[in-house]
Amino acid sequence: MRDSDVLDNNPHVSRSALEAIHGQVFGWALSRCNYEQAVAEDLVQQAYVELLTGKARFDGASSLKTFVFSVVHNLARSRYRRQAMRLRLAAKVAEPDITEPSEPGDHSALWRAVRDLPARQRDIVELVFCRDLTVEEASRVMGVSTGTGRVHYDRAKKALRGKLSHE
């Protein structure tokens, strides 16, 4: 890591390391926002701003990819919490016309079954199989213990086995 490549407020992060994982970070952000590209771009940009300003500080306790995925995950959760609050407030004032977000383009039986899983099971399956994280790293991204992550992972595999064997 060259000195000129290091972020001023995050000495363990380099621009080149962020560039190397950008595609994976963007893919993870897309999955956090129902594949809305503009929202995913905002999430990634906000994550990078937090890294640049030092608001999110990487200490090297995990891989950079795991850390940045965690930042994106937490930003998405915060965004949807705020959005849910606004919707609840709007519902008190008037009956809003709320439509469900569109689903990703892949309609295979497997991904339909994955989308039907509970949120944490769905997240761990995506992190492990699509984002190439270990169960331990995925657990850190999700903010749960490794044991809890393993339980969600095992339950997800059993549920998928059951759903796919009936189709």
Predicted regions and their residues:
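A short, charge-rich alpha-helical start-of-domain segment used by transcription regulators
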Residues: D3-G27, A38-E41, L52
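C-terminal flanking helix
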Residues: F26, Y48, P118, R122, ...
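Alpha-helical residues within the helix-turn-helix
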Residues: S31, R140
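Structural recognition of an alpha-helix C-terminal capping motif at a helix-to-coil junction
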Residues: D42-V49, S62-N74
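Arg/Lys-rich amphipathic alpha helix in sigma70-family domain 2
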Residues: T53, R57-D59, S70-A91, E103
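DNA-recognition helix of helix-turn-helix
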Residues: H73, E136, M142-E167
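Internal acidic/polar
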Residues: S78, R86-V114, T134
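A short pre-motif secondary-structure segment
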Residues: I124-V128
